[in-house]
């Protein structure tokens, strides 16, 4: 029944993965990669959810409120930590703190592309506000899951090496 989430050994105390957990479709993939590298994972959500019984995995339930989970993550993330989120403003805040951010479809957010992502988000919000109908995100598919796994593994390897290029 799948891979175990626990891996013997001590987690790397300098690297942490945070998940913007509400509606995140790739939590099991994060658990697998984190177990392989013995990394701590913190899921941040607005409501309780089931998480694996693993001493390296924690759930933080924040008060209901606009951006409460985002604010918690942004205030706790540190340089080279990894944040998994589909929220572009949260990704931007984390990049400002020196962390890495990966979208749930495997798109790494970087200093080079976050400005365009924010501008596109703002433009689409403005169009919707003006009554225009815009397409929502494409349905999540197995290729997204595969891209995400590769992007997360790349981010973990880069953080463990101390690679500052983003």
Question: Where are the language model's segments positioned?
Answer:
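Nuclease catalytic cores that cleave nucleic-acid phosphodiester bonds
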Residues: 2-166
């Amino acid at each position: 029944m799948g891979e175990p989430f626990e891996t013997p050994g001590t987690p790397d105390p300098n690297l942490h993965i945070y998940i913007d957990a509400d509606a995140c479709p790739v939590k099991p993939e994060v658990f697998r990669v984190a177990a392989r590298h013995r990394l701590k994972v913190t899921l941040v959500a607005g409501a309780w959810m089931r998480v694996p019984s693993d001493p390296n995995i924690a759930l933080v339930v924040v008060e209901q409120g606009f951006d409460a989970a985002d604010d918690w993550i942004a205030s706790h993330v540190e340089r080279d930590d990894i944040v998994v989120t589909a929220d572009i403003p949260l990704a931007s805040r984390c990049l400002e703190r020196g962390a890495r951010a990966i979208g749930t479809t495997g798109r790494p957010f970087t200093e080079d592309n976050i400005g365009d992502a924010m501008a596109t988000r703002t433009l689409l919000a403005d169009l919707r506000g003006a009554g225009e109908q815009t397409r929502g995100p494409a349905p999540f598919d197995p290729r997204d899951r595969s891209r995400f796994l590769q992007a997360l593994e790349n981010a973990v390897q880069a953080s463990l090496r101390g690679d500052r290029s983003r």
